[in-house]
């Protein structure tokens, strides 16, 4: 028999409550989480927009990242690009579920990350897999100024079955990671100057106007083409730390540098995070 008189009970405000009742959990969970890496700058590099363009787009950006290392500690995340779209096409033709397509696309983003890490290897930059970023990022960034990883979130077989194409892709993954770590900021590097009123490469491109500043709430109502994942817009509304994201043109030398120095050189998107 177990002597139950010796069992210690831990007083916990959540122990006897349902975690589904917001009114009960808010007094405990409503506080602002700590910032684990408040000095970190997260940079997401587009797969289709940058990496697929080859050396003419990649090498100047690598030089810019190299020059930024003395100023910032960076987590550089890469998207998948056109190869993921081909994988989607083949997978859909074979009838694969969305949860099987997600890790296949993520592997393509990882390949782009390895390419970028190889080019920055002389500066001590290496590629880290998801578990290492989750558990050992701080110690790696104490040894070097930057690391590279895949921007795809590791939903994989847990991907939401709301669409035949994975909805949580590279932009979404970069934001989730930056917000969870309490990073100083997130900059998304694309091949356009920011978010436009209409697709600048579409039939009505001549009428497209650059939105210098907007909000996730406004973009949620936006019906046009976005250079970002739609799921990212939804997640921005519930952000805890990242108050704004800047989308910049990585094909223009110096834009990324200016953005990381706090300059307004693209589209700034305000999230739902409250100022500290």
Q: Predicted segment positions?
A:
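C-terminal catalytic "cap/lid" subdomain
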Residues: 2-276
């Amino acid at each position: 028999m177990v002597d139950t008189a010796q069992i210690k009970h831990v007083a916990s405000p959540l122990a006897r409550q349902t975690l589904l009742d917001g009114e009960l959990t808010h007094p405990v969970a409503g506080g602002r989480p700590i910032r684990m890496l408040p000095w970190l700058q997260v940079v997401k590099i587009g797969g289709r927009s940058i990496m697929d363009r080859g050396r003419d787009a990649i090498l100047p950006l690598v030089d810019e990242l190299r020059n930024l290392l003395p100023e910032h500690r960076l987590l550089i995340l890469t998207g998948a690009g056109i190869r993921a779209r081909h994988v989607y096409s083949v997978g859909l033709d074979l009838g694969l579920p969305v949860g099987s397509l997600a890790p296949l696309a993520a592997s393509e983003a990882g390949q782009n990350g390895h390419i970028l890490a190889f080019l920055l290897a002389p500066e001590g930059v290496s590629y880290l897999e998801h578990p290492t970023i989750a558990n050992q990022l701080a110690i790696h960034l104490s040894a070097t100024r930057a690391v590279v990883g895949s921007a795809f979130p590791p939903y994989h077989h847990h991907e939401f079955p709301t669409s035949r194409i994975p909805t949580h892709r590279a932009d979404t993954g970069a934001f989730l990671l930056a917000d969870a770590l309490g990073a100083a900021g997130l900059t998304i590097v694309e091949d356009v100057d920011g978010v436009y009123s209409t697709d600048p490469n579409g039939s009505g491109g001549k009428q497209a106007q650059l939105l210098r500043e907007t909000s996730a709430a406004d973009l949620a109502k936006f019906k046009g083409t976005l250079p970002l994942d739609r799921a990212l817009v939804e997640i921005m509304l519930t952000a805890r730390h990242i108050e704004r994201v800047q989308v910049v043109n990585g094909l223009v030398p110096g834009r990324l540098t200016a953005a990381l120095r706090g300059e307004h050189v693209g589209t700034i998107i305000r999230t739902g995070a409250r100022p500290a």
